[in-house]
Amino acid sequence: MPLIGDKFPEMEVQTTHGPMELPDEFEGKWFILFSHPADFTPVCTTEFVAFQEVYPELRELDCELVGLSVDQVFSHIKWIEWIAENLDTEIEFPVIADTGRVADTLGLIHPARPTNTVRAVFVVDPEGIIRAILYYPQELGRNIPEIVRMIRAFRVIDAEGVAAPANWPDNQLIGDHVIVPPASDIETARKRKDEYECYDWWLCTQSRG
């Protein structure tokens, strides 16, 4: 099972948009792969609507989205049609129809429910490296804005070589500022308070950019 920091496994998948090769399909872009337990289920339906709502925002962040479950393509298609007809939402992102091979590779099959994928999220960067993995129980839907926040934060982290605080960009202590990496030697530590806004030499912040 791949972990954070690992290369996303190479795989050929069948989706509602046709065959794809991951992670090459999204080379140079961020992508989010999320698994859902099954089509035509209540919580998963609310999640698909919520993911579609933020899909344009994700694409503006140069991030793609792909769903996955152990269901056949025709099931995905009928469910997507149902969502469009009954919930007035056109699902625009691809959904992987998995026979179980992809789910096994990514560690998405729960032993107690071998026919259902767990509710998981993989965040993959433009180099194909897994940057975050989230798991949710079957009865709890995902917080979609948090997933978007992660993409925004990772882009800033990578571009500026900083860290993002809790609840960024609305942190209780430093607002939308970011955290400067701690000093790694005594001389740098001594200079820190003159260079940045600091609570102490090991907790210094700066404004964006």
Curated annotation (Swiss-Prot):
One of its GO terms (biological process) is cellular response to stress. GO terms for molecular function: thioredoxin peroxidase activity. Its main location: cytoplasm. Substrate binds at residue 119. It comes from the Archaea. The active site is at residue 44. InterPro entries: AhpC/TSA, Peroxiredoxin, Peroxiredoxin_AhpC-typ, Peroxiredoxin_C, Peroxiredoxin_TDXH, PRX_1cys, Thioredoxin-like_sf, Thioredoxin_domain. It catalyses: a hydroperoxide + [thioredoxin]-dithiol = an alcohol + [thioredoxin]-disulfide + H2O. It is found in: Cytoplasm. One of its GO terms (cellular component) is cytosol. The keyword Transport does not apply. Keywords: Antioxidant, Cytoplasm, Disulfide bond, Oxidoreductase, Peroxidase, Redox-active center. Its EC number is 1.11.1.24. Disulfide bonds join 198-204. Residues 2-156 form the Thioredoxin domain. PANTHER family: PEROXIREDOXIN 4 (PTHR10681:SF171), THIOREDOXIN PEROXIDASE (PTHR10681). Homodecamer. Pentamer of dimers that assemble into a ring structure. The active site is a conserved redox-active cysteine residue, the peroxidatic cysteine (C(P)), which makes the nucleophilic attack on the peroxide substrate. The peroxide oxidizes the C(P)-SH to cysteine sulfenic acid (C(P)-SOH), which then reacts with another cysteine residue, the resolving cysteine (C(R)), to form a disulfide bridge. The disulfide is subsequently reduced by an appropriate electron donor to complete the catalytic cycle. Thiol-specific peroxidase that catalyzes the reduction of hydrogen peroxide and organic hydroperoxides to water and alcohols, respectively. Plays a role in cell protection against oxidative stress by detoxifying peroxides. Belongs to the peroxiredoxin family. Prx6 subfamily. This is Peroxiredoxin. It comes from Methanothermobacter thermautotrophicus (strain ATCC 29096 / DSM 1053 / JCM 10044 / NBRC 100330 / Delta H) (Methanobacterium thermoautotrophicum).
